[in-house]
From Swiss-Prot:
GO terms for cellular component: cytosol. PANTHER family: UPF0234 PROTEIN YAJQ. Keywords: Nucleotide-binding. Nucleotide-binding protein. Disulfide bonds: none annotated. The lineage of its organism: Bacteria, Pseudomonadati, Pseudomonadota, Gammaproteobacteria, Pseudomonadales. Belongs to the YajQ family. It comes from Azotobacter vinelandii (strain DJ / ATCC BAA-1303). Pfam families: DUF520 (PF04461). SUPFAM superfamilies: YajQ-like. This is Nucleotide-binding protein Avin_13410. InterPro entries: DUF520, UPF0234-like_C, UPF0234_N, YajQ-like_sf. GO terms for molecular function: nucleotide binding.
């Protein structure tokens, strides 16, 4: 029976490259040189700047760097900025994996579409099976057309 998996993954190497490019861009900009920094650990990116407007500019630099490296910026989750001494900090979480709420939403979308496929939640992914390859391709088109707030990838397509 044909099937595929719906996942949400990040290419960590591309994210690291994008952060490195953002750091280089920060050093190139005259107005931001030496006044801000990016710190990347695991799935958390900490932005440090002298003022809020600099922080906003750094976020834009980061977004542009991620887009250039073909990383979907929907995976970014912004925490509130906070003052720490003379600097302002903000954490950006890189979300990965499909959480239970989103998985339930995907399953509900598939069921409501009346396609002849079944969706099952398996940890941080959703497995969709059907009798025909065409039905699975319709399910992929349906999910791509929806705005779910997370970048989705479709892999492990089996006939």
């Amino acid at each position: 029976m044909p099937s595929f998996d719906v996942v949400s993954e990040l290419d960590k190497h591309e994210v690291t490259n994008a952060v490195d490019n953002a750091i280089k861009e920060l050093d190139r900009r005259y107005d931001l040189r030496g006044k801000g920094s990016f710190e990347f650990k695991d799935k958390t990116l900490t932005l440090t700047a002298e003022a809020d407007f600099m922080l906003e500019q750094m976020i834009e630099i980061l977004k542009l760097a991620l887009i250039k490296r073909k990383v979907d910026i929907q995976c970014l989750e912004y925490k509130d900025s906070y003052a720490s001494g003379k600097v302002v900090k903000q954490e950006v979480i890189l979300r990965e994996g499909i959480d239970k709420d989103l998985a339930k939403k995907i399953v509900a979308l598939i069921k409501d579409s009346k396609l002849k496929v079944q969706a099952a939640i398996q940890g941080e992914q959703v497995r969709i099976t059907g009798k025909k390859r065409d039905d699975l391709q319709e399910a992929i088109a349906l999910l791509r057309g929806q705005e779910l707030g997370m970048p989705l990838q479709f892999n492990n397509f089996r006939d």
